[in-house]
């Protein structure tokens, strides 16, 4: 029985090897077109470091990922300009949590509520 297993494996291995050889011999249409174009235009190989456009973009540096990033940066610039224009404003918010004793008393409303009556 073990001899039968070895014989059954041999055709599978040979078929895998034959498949690899067939793949090497058969060229996809894209590869054949690429070979034709390389033969026709030998000087147009891929440039080292990518295309000129990509190189320019990388040198320039990307400022914003999308319009949201642009708007956030724009708002920060406006906030910086406003803070430099009014430096005497000393009111700081968010430093402490208010308690009922810290809050001012409510003023009575001038208009009587229709629900209270």
Curated annotation (Swiss-Prot):
Sequence segments annotated as region (Disordered): 1-52, 79-117
UniProt similarity note: Belongs to the endosulfine family.
Principal subcellular localisation of the protein: cytoplasm
Domain of life, per lineage: Eukaryota
An example Gene Ontology molecular-function term: phosphatase inhibitor activity
Record's function text: Protein phosphatase inhibitor that specifically inhibits protein phosphatase 2A (PP2A) during mitosis. When phosphorylated at Ser-67 during mitosis, specifically interacts with ppp2r2d (PR55-delta) and inhibits its activity, leading to inactivation of PP2A, an essential condition to keep cyclin-B1-CDK1 activity high during M phase.
Name of the encoding gene: arpp19
Phosphothreonine, modified sites: 99
GO cellular component, as recorded: cytoplasm
Post-translational modification: Phosphorylation at Ser-67 by gwl during mitosis is essential for interaction with PPP2R2D (PR55-delta) and subsequent inactivation of PP2A.
InterPro entries tied to this protein: Endosulphine
Record protein name field: cAMP-regulated phosphoprotein 19
PANTHER family according to UniProt: CAMP-REGULATED PHOSPHOPROTEIN 19, ENDOSULFINE
Keyword Metal-binding applies: no
Modified-residue entries (Phosphoserine), positions: 28, 67, 109
Record-linked Pfam families: Endosulfine (PF04667)
UniProt subcellular location: Cytoplasm
Compositional bias ranges of the Basic and acidic residues kind: 1-37
Key word Transport present: no
Assigned keywords, A-Z: Cell cycle, Cell division, Cytoplasm, Mitosis, Phosphoprotein, Protein phosphatase inhibitor
The protein's assembly and partners: Interacts (when phosphorylated at Ser-67) with ppp2r2d.
GO terms classed as biological process: cell division; G2/M transition of mitotic cell cycle; mitotic cell cycle
């Amino acid at each position: 029985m073990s001899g039968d297993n070895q014989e059954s494996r041999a055709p599978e291995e040979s078929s895998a090897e034959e498949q690899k050889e067939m793949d090497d011999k058969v060229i996809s249409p894209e590869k054949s077109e690429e070979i034709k174009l390389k033969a026709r235009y030998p000087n147009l190989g891929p440039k080292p470091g990518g295309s000129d456009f990509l190189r320019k973009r990388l040198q320039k540096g990307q400022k914003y990922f999308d319009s949201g990033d642009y708007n956030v940066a724009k708002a920060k610039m406006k906030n910086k300009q406003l803070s430099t224009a009014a430096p005497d404003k000393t009111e700081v918010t968010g430093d402490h949590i208010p308690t009922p004793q810290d809050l001012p008393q409510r003023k009575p409303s001038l208009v009587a509520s229709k629900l209270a009556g």
